[in-house]
């Protein structure tokens, strides 16, 4: 069993699968019905919710066993949630935001695969059946590749006409924070060989925390 995920409600048997399914459909239905009452985006919310449920079912039943595809499905799930949130808030999404969300989600998904593989190599406990289809070297290359794409995409985003016209033409000054954050994260997992769970790292690493806070402050000052 996964050293962390085994404590989740369903995995730890605190919530039965039947109860979880009932709660899922009740909450999903209540949310979509609520949007039907307050605005006309209810049908789109239903489509997003239905698509997300089907995607998760396909992932749970068989796609999570397929290397590479499993991580891409996780990233697609984030895009569906992003689209649903935009519909609910009546916000027009920028194609830059969609692209960066997908690539960042893909990066984090592969980072977790690397963490699972490292745990398997150290303890012999396999928490994900398809993890044997990966190697540390391969995942290091993938993470380096995706981190480069994230950096380039963010730079292009800050320089794009639609962003400079609506926000600030000086948004590019936030680029060093993004680069520093990426390089620090890669240093943690490749040099320090630490746990590469993004949540754990962000909660514990002061350098990364300062980088995120610095980016947020400068970004907010520039657009407001």
Q: Model regions: which residues?
A:
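Cytosolic, membrane-interface loops and tails of multi-pass inner-membrane proteins
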Residues: 1-12, 110-137, 191-198
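Multi-pass membrane catalytic core of lipid/isoprenoid biosynthesis enzymes
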Residues: 1-49, 95-106, 141-151, 206-224
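Transmembrane helix-loop-helix
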Residues: 21-60, 64, 151-179, 183
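C-terminal ends of transmembrane helices
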Residues: 54-67, 112-120, 184-194
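Cytoplasmic-side transmembrane-helix entry/capping segments in multi-pass membrane proteins
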Residues: 67-77, 202-208
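Membrane-water interface at loop-to-transmembrane-helix junctions
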Residues: 91-92, 127-146, 205
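Alpha-helical transmembrane segments
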Residues: 91-110, 166-179
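Interfacial loop-to-transmembrane junctions
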Residues: 186-213
